[in-house]
Amino acid sequence: MHAELSEMELRIVARLNEEIGKDASQLHRASHLVSHYKKHLQVLSQTLDYEDPQNVSCYKTAFQCQQQVCESIDFELEKLAHFEDKLKRKLKECQPVLEGVAEDLDKVRQLQRLQQYLLLVQDIQEISAALGNAINGKDEDKLVNIYLTLYEGNDCEHSVVGRLHAVQAQSLKSFAERTAIYWHKLLLKRLSSAFEAVLKSMRWAHLEQQALNYSSARDTAKAQLLAEYMFLIKSPAEERAPLQSITPSIVCQPINRVVQLLLAPYRQRFQFHFTGTRQTNRLDKPEWFYTQILNWGKETHFFVGKTFQPAAIKAGKLDYNLRLEFIRGLVQLAIEKLAVDIEQIAQDQILFAHLLDETLAFESELRETFGYPASFPSAISVITQPMYLLRWISLEERFCAEKMDDILQAETPFQLIDPNSFENDLKIPKCADQFMRLLDAIKDRYYGLIQPGHQLQFLHLQLELIDSFRQRLVQLHSSGAVPSIPILNAINYLVMVLREWGENVHYLHLHAALAGPNATEINSVFEHAVAELEHWARQLMRNLATKATNEMKAKSMSYRRDAWPTMPEQNSREPFILSPSGGEMFQVLVTLLHNLERELSANLFTQTLRLIAHQIDDFMLESMVMNTKFSAAGAAQFNYDMTRNLFALFGQYTRRPELLFKRTHDACKLLAAARGTALLLLETLRGNQSVEEKTKPLRELHVLSMDSKQCIEVLERRMDIKMF
């Protein structure tokens, strides 16, 4: 191991690597680099030679400059030291004087602070007096500007209260804020009265809404100006104002005064029609007040945004959407109404179910028509309060249970949706389609819920319903009321749809909420339900395949007992035909496969076909080949029956049927091989050769799915090979 290189050596190596590079063909450059650096060293050596006459003057000048700089620095340091001593003596002499005037200086500072304090009090009093003189005048602009000098915001240095924000004078701050709050109330009352008068002249909120399109330009401009003034003036109390509580569980930001005034006539009309003993105030007709809210919003929201949004922008409220705030105020009327009525409505199942439908429809139209944000208060917040949410879920569960019973007790629940389209790969029973529509309807109802926790409760209900539907199918099948094929088609459709839903963004979000932020894998929320359905489907397909194979086996007795050992040689001029003894067996198989293809969905039929083929493959090898002796003619006939009939039959449904019957196909190759080849192969397999040497001749015959022991047993079935 070489010792670690120093920093300088590493720099030299890096420089050489940079100069020569990684290309081995450039190594000849090393000699050039050596000569180059030698010349460079000579030049440096000559430059640094102090005895060289040419360098004497240069070095002499440099040394002289350095000496002069050092002398200058020493001189300045000496001056600083003298000044420090002088300053210390002076401070020591003046210390008694400073101590003598310190108390007076403190008094001066106190007087200065008192002066500033009194000036601020004077400013507040002068502003208050100016507001008092202007409050009854007609100049609102002057009135607002005077108020803004008193308060514009806690962080605004242009107002008195803003300047006091960082000052430790609680009494003065309290006095300034109380003064601002007092005048804010009076000023807001004055502007509100003027604003209401202008709205009245504009015929705002009257039934003749066409008047909005013909409002006087003067009235509109006046309303905009007053709105701007009300947006501009703020109260210190607003900075710490609590959230508005609509219901004990629903809180939101308070509605701005401008929006309150715009809403006032609508609130009055709403209370007139939908409270008390009015005929329009009916518990069974929530759609009446929902429709009224939507109609008012449609009639006015564009006008509100177009007319008053510029006023908010001029007042500095750039992120304030007045149109949506107005809609929020209208929705709040519905929330307040619903909060009062829901307790009584929830006692009646029919009324409660109707309220749920109408509320969900109302929320959907709000979002589609007005772009109502999900973060705003909504009527859904009322019906998702814990006690009502549980009642809603219970109602959904009861309704779905009854609906499932109706679906499965119908006259033909397992009839295919389009029974005539047998070319269709997917066979969908009516009951499966109706059940999935039922689940999808539940999703549509809870899709608009804001909180993931509420949505997860409905997802849990969906999963319970899937399991309940599966159990109902199990009962129907176990009792013999419904055969396996319709059940399989129903399960297959459920699995297909649930897999598709599992990749839907809505259900992926629910999975994320369920699994949490630390989940390592993204799975489907229906994973467990799908696994249970698929497990049962595999069991049903195995039973179906076993039943089909047993029917074929029942017709195979004559074929298995045919004269395979004594079968005469086939005339070479005559073509092979199917063994007469196998006709009935193959006919049963033809009918079974045809019926399965016609009745099962394509993917189920493909899986069942493989299961049937696997069982037939085992049966043909173990019950037929291993229990029978074959003459050469018998082996040829059996090979023909298998490869040209059995394989061809399955070839109608799959591209390479021989892959489904690997062991039977290999047995046919061994039985039909030439006698000499068979003898040599048997001798090799019985010998003491290695496994590789034994499998090599098998690979040459393309016998790949049987081990040497099984191959020996098959070869011993040949009559033309003597047993030793």
Swiss-Prot record:
Residues 163-724 form the RINT1/TIP20 domain. PROSITE patterns: RINT1_TIP20. GO terms for biological process: cleavage furrow ingression; endoplasmic reticulum to Golgi vesicle-mediated transport; Golgi organization; Golgi vesicle transport; male meiosis cytokinesis; regulation of ER to Golgi vesicle-mediated transport; retrograde vesicle-mediated transport, Golgi to endoplasmic reticulum. It comes from the Eukaryota. Gene3D superfamilies: Dsl1p vesicle tethering complex, Tip20p subunit, domain D. One of its GO terms (cellular component) is Dsl1/NZR complex. During cytokinesis in male meiotic cells, required for completion of cleavage furrow ingression possibly in conjunction with Zw10. Required for maintenance of Golgi stack number and morphology. Essential for acroblast assembly. Belongs to the RINT1 family. PANTHER family: RAD50-INTERACTING PROTEIN 1 (PTHR13520:SF0), RAD50-INTERACTING PROTEIN 1 RINT-1 (PTHR13520). This is RINT1-like protein. It comes from Drosophila melanogaster (Fruit fly). The lineage of its organism: Eukaryota, Metazoa, Ecdysozoa, Arthropoda, Hexapoda.
